[in-house]
Amino acid sequence: MQNSSPVSSTPDALPDSQPDSQPDDALRLGPVQAAQRLVLLHGWGADADDLLDLGELLVGPEVSVVALRAPEPHPSGSGRQWYSLQPIDWSALPAARLALRQRLERLAASVALENTVLLGFSQGSAMAIDVGCGLPLAGIVGCSGYPHQGWQAAGALPPVLLSHGREDPVVPFEASEELRRQLLQAGGQVELLPFSGGHGIDPELLPDLGAFVRRCLRGED
């Protein structure tokens, strides 16, 4: 579940990035002191740098962009994972969920969760929806994701925007349809943007994704 960003990104190409308190766990773009933030969760087998260029395209220079690195090494020896998918280890999910929640709460010390949008791709999208729906976030973007086993939407949900390719061979399009169904059933505000394509983020949807993120950060959704 790699190559999710429409443009490549590497840490060496980020001269204006800001060091994180745990530099191996996150990459940053934007001002050190910001009022708003976009947090990025990469997919299975990718790394923190994978979505940075995408994040920069979606928000203005005044917004802090933080790309988190998944805690576990990918079994291929390259990239990272939020939990094992080969084989799927659902028993590791509670710890992964708690670890991500704690990282987001630490980030909230500088930018409030109410002023933060969480965006994830594939496995990162599953984590964003699972953890983010239990936090007072400004919004969530889930790209080519899926619902975790046993997950149920509940409580006061942030606005959610989903995108998914109808021909996705990795995560079936129906997974996002199921997410949409569950979120609507729980009273959430959710939109699903389908596109003709496979497992990725459609460049033609970037204006829609950016508009949603900016509306959420302005408190309009």
Task: Locate the predicted segments by residue.
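C-terminal catalytic histidine-bearing segment of alpha/beta-hydrolase fold enzymes
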Residues: E174-D221
